[in-house]
Amino acid sequence: MNKKIYLVRHGKIDTGKEKCYIGVTDLTLSKEGIVQAQKLKKFFQNIHIEKAYVSPLIRCVQTADIILENRNVERILMRELMEINLGQWEKKSFSYIKRFFPEQFKNRGENIATFVTPGGESFEQLRKRVIPVFEAIKENTKDNVLIVAHAGVNRVILSSILSISINDMFKINQDYGCVNEIFWNDELKKLQCKKIM
């Protein structure tokens, strides 16, 4: 496998002054996010991309459109690549949840893999949604591919490759506009990854 999978997190979004839970809430890129996407475009300008698999949330679509502007690359929107659904916690600040739902807040912190937000999904459920799609992308492409997704989605993919538990996946840093390169190591006979931007 000489091909590479470039796993990208979308550019920055504007969530206001307070840190909020944002999963499937459909927010556009901020001005800073657009600048980050333009830097990604420059990074990828000389890298051949066969296809792009993109979360249908607008922040990912915008990021992919900027990266691939004026390039004849097929873009495939995949609902399975959407961010974790945080249900009733969507758009609520961390401080609000901690204040009004202290038991749930504590429970999520202690059981991050299995905790399901009311009306949402757990990271374990997210992994079950994302990994089969990632495996299909990996097996069914012959050349370099781009995946534009979200911090949660990227972490479940990377933690799966690195054999890291969901409980420890937040140790994997996924800044806005970051790039992870996934490749096959012939010597070790396994899939590897590294953050390159």
Question: For each of these PLM feature ranges, what is it?
Answer:
Residues 1-3, 77, 84-99, 143, ...:
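Acidic, low-complexity terminal tails and accessory targeting/binding regions
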Residues 1-6, 51:
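Extreme N-terminal starter segment of soluble prokaryotic enzymes
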Residues 5, 141-152:
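Generic beta-sheet signal
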Residues 9-62, 117-130:
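Loop-to-helix element that buttresses phosphate recognition and phosphoryl-transfer chemistry
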Residues 11, 55-57, 80, 148-152:
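Short, well-ordered beta-to-alpha junction loops that form the rim of enzyme active sites
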Residues 40-105:
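Phosphate-coordination/substrate-recognition cap region in phosphate-metabolizing enzymes
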Residues 45-48, 137-144:
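Glycine-rich phosphate-binding loop signature in dinucleotide/nucleotide-binding domains
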Residues 106, 110-138:
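Internal catalytic-core helix/loop-beta-alpha segment
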